[in-house]
Amino acid sequence: MIIDNKTTTIRDDFNNDFKVEYNLIKTNVDDNIIYGFSVNTTNMSDNTNLYKEFLDFTKDLEYAKEIFEKLMENLVLPLNLVNVLDEIIN
């Protein structure tokens, strides 16, 4: 279930505009609540989509919210979601 969502538009080095949607996700796994993230981009010129999710991240909602804000601040794209999460949490 999506519990928070933010959307922005970014432009790459080739002047392509991308709509980027960030989701904070709550999942029940074996009666445990786990929080994770998904990032979805849509290329505005050709409507191609790229989607990546990382669901099994933390049980701590406040920590998940903090990381969610950092994803948005750093304009993280689906291709580098896992790598950026590794950098943020280390």
Feature map (PLM): residue ranges:
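A positively charged, amphipathic N-terminal helix/segment that binds anionic biomolecules
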Residues: 18-29, 82
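Generic marker of residues within folded, mature protein domains
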Residues: 12-14, 27, 54
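Negatively charged, low-complexity tracts enriched in Asp/Glu with abundant Ser/Thr
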Residues: 1-23
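A short, structured beta-strand/loop element
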Residues: 29-52
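Mixed-charge, Lys/Arg-enriched low-complexity segments
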Residues: 45-90
